[in-house]
Amino acid sequence: NDFAAVAVSKGPGSYTGLRVGISSAKGLCYALDIPLISINTLEIIGAGLRSYVKGNIISLIHAREDEFYYLVYDNKMKIIKETSIEYLNSNSFLKFYGEQELNIIGLGINICKKILKNKKINYPDSESLPSSKNMVSLSEKKFKNEDFENLIYFEPNYVKNFYLSKKK
């Protein structure tokens, strides 16, 4: 009875993990008759970084091979490029360099570094997981703005279709 809302990561991420997390959150919201707040996983990853870097931030998650989910925003969390998926190459992200540094954070940083090979990119953390601590300020803002999800129609943001491979 002490809950005012439930916040959940909406993706991108693991298909199964997103399904389980969102189903659990929706169940709590239905049972307690409280609103659901969803936060982009990539925003959660970068939220802790915004207060101590200058320049644009790219949060990313390694999907598979050289493919990454990413989101680009400035250090005030204003989105510059919505969540996308891309096969990275040495020219990826060049258009997001500003007058200040470009910061990349997320999962799969070591693979990203090998592909980009760019000395002008700052990697503040070697690997950064989505953290519930980083969700707090993002969730509070959405709660105050009454930015809630429709419990019936809300679905995870998978970004791309499910990928199956044959057993080897």
Language model segments and positions:
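Glycine-rich, flexible loop/turn motifs
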Residues: 11-14, 18, 45, 57, ...
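N-terminal beta-alpha supersecondary unit
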Residues: 1-8, 129
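DPxDG-like acidic metal-binding loop motif
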Residues: 5-41
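Surface "functional belts" at beta-alpha junctions
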Residues: 35-129, 163-164
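Catalytic-loop motifs flanking and including active-site residues across diverse enzymes
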Residues: 21-24, 89, 131-135
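Active-site catalytic microenvironments for nucleophilic, acid-base chemistry
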Residues: 31, 48-52, 138-142
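Acyltransferase
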Residues: 124-168
